[in-house]
């Protein structure tokens, strides 16, 4: 792997407008080759999408997805900059795909890491710090292990961090950025709600013997 310097990361950011972590990842994937890293970012749809990310996305559409068997349903709001784009095939296809992703990910609760409340992060840290396999380890080592575990756990709760169900080489965030690059507008997943049939309802469970006895008394 090539030597990934801060200057190299800055040069790539200046050329593409991509985020620092995306630039580092691109340079790592291409062994520090600036031209190849630029191409890598473009293929991922990140290079041009990042430059649009600061623009206001106030238009868009609310999509729905009902999974086969009608036991899981999703409502999702996807925003863009213009009504014209919201009606287009690329945007509508993305809306359907991201809604389907939510249906397939029952553990997902938030759109992005930034939305996770601080008390949830603290609770996860307390749980991890109390695990038996960390007892006896130096505090500094323990903190490092816990940090990695928390990051993994929090990413499991975040929609944009999920591997895309139709192509696991992409995350949902990268999928959205690709669409933004194609369209030429900022696109944001604003919010979603996932419904599961019977969720929260206490069911009266009967074992087989009780069920037979009940039928005989009726």
Swiss-Prot record:
GO MF entry, a single one: translation elongation factor activity
Cell compartment(s), UniProt: Cytoplasm
PROSITE patterns: EF_TS_1, EF_TS_2
Classification via InterPro entries: EF-Ts_dimer_sf, Transl_elong_EFTs/EF1B, Transl_elong_EFTs/EF1B_dimer, Transl_elong_Ts_CS, UBA-like_sf
Pfam families the UniProt entry points to: EF_TS (PF00889)
Keywords: Cytoplasm, Elongation factor, Protein biosynthesis
Gene Ontology CC annotations of this record: cytoplasm
Region (Involved in Mg(2+) ion dislocation from EF-Tu), start-end ranges: 82-85
Functional summary from the UniProt entry: Associates with the EF-Tu.GDP complex and induces the exchange of GDP to GTP. It remains bound to the aminoacyl-tRNA.EF-Tu.GTP complex up to the GTP hydrolysis stage on the ribosome.
HAMAP family referenced in this protein's UniProt entry, alphabetically: EF_Ts
Family named by the database record: Belongs to the EF-Ts family.
NCBIfam families for this protein: tsf
Record protein name field: Elongation factor Ts
Gene: tsf
């Amino acid at each position: 792997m090539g030597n990934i310097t801060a200057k190299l990361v800055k040069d790539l950011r200046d050329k593409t407008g991509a985020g620092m972590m995306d630039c580092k990842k691109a340079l790592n994937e291409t062994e520090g080759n600036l031209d190849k890293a630029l191409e890598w970012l473009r293929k991922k749809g990140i290079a041009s999408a990042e430059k649009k990310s600061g623009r206001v996305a106030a238009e868009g559409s609310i999509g729905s997805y009902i999974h086969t068997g009608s036991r899981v349903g999703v409502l999702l709001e996807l925003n863009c900059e213009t009504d014209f784009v919201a009606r287009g095939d690329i945007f509508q296809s993305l809306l359907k795909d991201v809604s389907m992703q939510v249906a397939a990910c029952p553990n997902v609760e938030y759109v992005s890491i930034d939305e996770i409340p601080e008390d949830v992060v603290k609770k996860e840290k307390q749980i991890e710090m109390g695990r038996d396999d960390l007892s006896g380890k130096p505090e500094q080592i323990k903190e490092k292990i816990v940090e990695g575990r928390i990051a993994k756990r929090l990413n499991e709760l975040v929609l944009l961090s999920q591997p895309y169900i139709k192509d696991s080489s992409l995350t949902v965030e990268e999928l959205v950025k690709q669409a933004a690059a194609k369209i030429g507008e900022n696109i944001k997943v604003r919010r979603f709600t996932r419904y599961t049939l019977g969720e929260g309802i206490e069911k009266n469970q009967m074992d087989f013997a009780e069920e037979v006895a009940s039928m005989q008394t009726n």
